[in-house]
């Protein structure tokens, strides 16, 4: 059969006709209008984006009142550190003195911002402490240093920036990057494969090449694959050029002569080109990972290959199926699958729908380009159930002249190109406008090679198409999943559409209220705000920072659903770390456990979630602790002027190291708080000396033990002379 396949990226050759085996899916393909092989360094004076993402607090700065009043530093002793830990309710480790009269203490265990604030508040109540502050993090204030992002004279990165009156089509990413950059999220780009590009490679997970051998009817061999073999573990893009010689072959007879597109590399760069590396471009979710999956070859890809690729990319292939098909297990299942491809063959193929259903059941959203035919109908698989179908708009926010719209379209995203509405007087590419040189393309990673990878070098190119629009949506979906991995696919789609920005007045889509263009224009900031609005509010706490081993411990939590979200929440407690305990009532707000013996640091996570996948967690950190004790001491006795030695022997039921603090130590005597050694080299004067010793395990102090040191005068004669005196008198 023969079908017409349109690229979802638009250019000088915007439509290809291909011969297919089953439904054949072609690139929603490209036009290269600008090439940048290098870029100037970022100039100074960029606009700051505000606070950066800070790690959890790890240190406190403490000022002691005695040091402040004396104006001189006081030695930091073990008892003083122990007291600080006890007062703060957590184990603190002494780090170092500061240049000023202050000291840095480190949390022995990770703490949240709220927990650090609690510790600081407790310490501030101690009369011995003048002040406490959480040691914060300072960052340079920057826009991404990638040179094309920073060049405002030619706004190549308009599609990522906040919308303005003159450039209304931006996806509004800068404010979102203060919240998340996609770390932890995986986006599968099922496309032409990947070219090794410096501005992309660090974020690439190499997946699989799904392109099968050609059918005998099409000449057999690997003409479409163009890599000399069939399916394998190398998703590299070998190039997809078409020559006049290729067109002489039946399989490529309806294809247009063209250079290699490097389509998958451009799409992947829009999702996750490396950010803040001082060169090139930046991706929507530039700390996410792209799972490169190759399913499009020269001119097109086979529908059956693409369906398999969807299953595999989502991690939905069962082990038995993997064994049967020879497919390896996917170690990096994607939460987002991008399909910048399409077919005009009509309805959604059953194999594609089944693959999409399986991917969604595995928790992935499937984002698909609507096509580039300029029609009020969308291509397949954009018309499959459950996908996020993406049309494209221009820098002005008008529907792009090539972009398909119609029933099933979910949202519009930056795709570049020319306006549909002539009355908008959209300036052509490269012309001088009020805001600088007009750039009508989507700028991303590519190659300038015309054929094989070895014929070109990594560059940055502009392309237009719904192929370019779809990865913007995939990138923002990755940001949502990075922020909340538990989201359901329909929930993620609902957030994206509910938060979409209205089309500007006078544009094609603003003039059609039938929903043909979807909910509006992609807005990353509004999407993340919507996520926060629907996330439950939770708290969790323990009875005290330190609990006694063997005691019954009750944890408590609160969970409040947000207006507009589901009002029924499910609760779950999990032990995160520490000696294993048995949690009872772990699906309620008040679980219970018995503190283990021996004890140790314990961490528990409380999560409240709803059926849509909105979830919030709070962690409780506490310590099960047994009190240290001191073995019974034998009271030492000495003669005036003689030495006195004894050593304290302490034990701790948790195996924590025991230190000691002593009071009543006589003048001239020493007590080592680490070893427990008492030494008095010249015990004088005679008398009884009571020394009180308190053991500490660094968290709590045990019972005080006392020992009485007896110092006696030398024995005297009582009416008779001693032997020395008698000898001196010659009487002995």
Positions of predicted regions on the chain:
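Extracellular S/T/G-rich loop segment that most often corresponds to the catalytic His/Ser-adjacent loop
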Residues: 213, 364, 379-482, 486, ...
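A cross-kingdom C-terminal cell-surface attachment/processing module
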Residues: 722-732
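C-terminal subdomain of the subtilisin-like protease fold in secreted/lumenal serine endopeptidases
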Residues: 311-315, 320-341, 347-355, 362, ...
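Primarily auto-inhibitory N-terminal propeptides
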Residues: 38-159, 175-177
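Protease zymogen maturation seam
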Residues: 42-43, 98-100, 124-186, 194-203, ...
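Subtilisin-like peptidase catalytic core
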Residues: 185, 192, 204-206, 210-347, ...
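Solvent-exposed loop segments of extracellular immunoglobulin-like
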Residues: 565-572, 654-660
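Surface-exposed, flexible coil segments in extracellular/virion-facing regions
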Residues: 574-593, 665-667, 671-677
């Amino acid at each position: 059969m023969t079908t017409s396949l349109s690229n979802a990226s638009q250019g000088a050759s915007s439509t290809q006709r291909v011969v297919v085996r089953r439904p054949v899916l072609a690139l929603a393909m490209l036009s290269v209008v600008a090439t940048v092989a290098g870029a100037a360094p970022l100039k100074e004076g960029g606009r700051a984006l505000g606070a950066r993402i800070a790690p959890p607090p790890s240190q406190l700065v403490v000022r002691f009142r005695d040091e402040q009043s004396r104006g001189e530093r006081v030695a930091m002793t073990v008892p003083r550190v122990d007291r600080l830990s006890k007062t703060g309710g957590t184990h603190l480790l002494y780090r170092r003195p500061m240049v000023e009269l202050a000291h840095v203490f480190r949390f022995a265990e990770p703490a949240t911002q709220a927990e650090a604030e609690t510790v600081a508040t407790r310490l501030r109540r101690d009369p011995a402490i003048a002040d406490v502050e959480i040691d914060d993090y300072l960052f340079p204030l920057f826009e991404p240093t990638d040179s094309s992002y920073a060049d405002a004279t030619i706004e190549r990165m308009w599609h990522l920036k906040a919308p303005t009156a003159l450039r209304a089509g931006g996806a509004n990413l800068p404010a979102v990057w203060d919240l998340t950059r996609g770390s932890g999220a995986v986006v599968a780009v099922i496309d032409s494969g990947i070219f090794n590009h410096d501005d992309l490679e660090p974020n690439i997970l190499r997946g699989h090449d799904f392109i099968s051998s050609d059918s005998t009817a099409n000449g057999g061999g690997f003409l479409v694959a163009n890599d000399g073999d069939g399916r394998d573990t190398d998703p590299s893009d070998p190039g997809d050029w078409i020559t006049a010689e290729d067109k002489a072959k039946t399989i490529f007879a309806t294809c247009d002569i063209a250079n290699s597109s490097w389509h998958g590399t451009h799409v992947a760069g829009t999702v996750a080109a490396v950010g803040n590396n001082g060169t090139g471009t930046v991706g929507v979710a530039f700390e996410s990972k792209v799972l490169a999956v190759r399913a499009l070859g020269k001119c097109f890809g086979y529908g059956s290959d693409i369906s398999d690729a969807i299953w595999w990319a989502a991690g939905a292939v069962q082990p038995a199926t993997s064994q049967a098909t020879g497919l390896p297990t996917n170690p990096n299942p994607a939460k987002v699958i991008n399909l910048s491809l399409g077919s005009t063959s009509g309805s959604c193929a059953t194999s594609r729908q089944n693959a999409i259903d399986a991917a969604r059941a595995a928790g992935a959203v499937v984002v698909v380009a609507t096509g580039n035919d300029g029609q009020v109908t969308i291509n397949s698989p954009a018309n499959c159930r459950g996908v996020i179908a993406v049309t494209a708009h221009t820098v002005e926010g008008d529907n792009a002249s090539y972009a398909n719209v119609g029933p099933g379209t979910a949202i519009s995203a930056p795709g570049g190109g020319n306006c549909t509405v002539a009355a908008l007087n959209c300036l052509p590419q490269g012309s001088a406008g009020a805001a600088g040189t007009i750039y009508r393309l989507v700028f991303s990673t590519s190659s300038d090679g015309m054929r094989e990878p070895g014929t070109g070098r990594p560059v940055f190119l502009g392309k237009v198409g719904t192929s370019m629009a779809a990865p913007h949506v995939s990138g923002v979906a990755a940001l949502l999943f990075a922020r909340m991995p538990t989201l359901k696919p329909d929930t993620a789609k609902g957030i994206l559409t509910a938060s979409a920005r209205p089309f500007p007045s006078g544009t094609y889509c603003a003039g059609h209220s039938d929903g043909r263009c979807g909910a509006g224009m992609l807005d990353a900031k509004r999407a993340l705000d919507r996520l926060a609005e629907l996330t439950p509010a939770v708290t969790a706490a323990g009875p005290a920072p330190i609990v006694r081993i063997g005691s019954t411990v009750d944890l408590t939590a609160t969970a409040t659903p947000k207006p507009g979200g589901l009002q029924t929440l499910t609760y779950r407690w999990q032990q995160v770390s520490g000696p294993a305990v048995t949690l009872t009532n772990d699906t309620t707000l008040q679980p219970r456990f018995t503190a283990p013996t021996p004890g140790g640091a314990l961490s528990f996570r409380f999560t409240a979630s709803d059926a849509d996948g909105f979830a919030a967690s709070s962690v409780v950190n506490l310590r099960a602790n047994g009190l240290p004790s001191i073995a019974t001491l034998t009271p030492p006795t000495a003669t005036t002027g003689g030495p006195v030695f004894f050593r304290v022997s302490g034990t701790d039921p948790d195996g924590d190291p025991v230190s000691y603090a002593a009071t009543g130590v006589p003048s001239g005597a020493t007590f080592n708080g680490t070893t427990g050694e008492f030494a008095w080299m010249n015990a004088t004067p005679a008398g009884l000396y009571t020394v009180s010793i308190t053991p500490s395990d660094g968290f709590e102090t045990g019972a005080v033990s006392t020992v009485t040191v007896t110092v006696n005068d030398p024995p005297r004669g009582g009416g008779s002379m001693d032997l020395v005196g008698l000898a001196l008198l010659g009487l002995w």
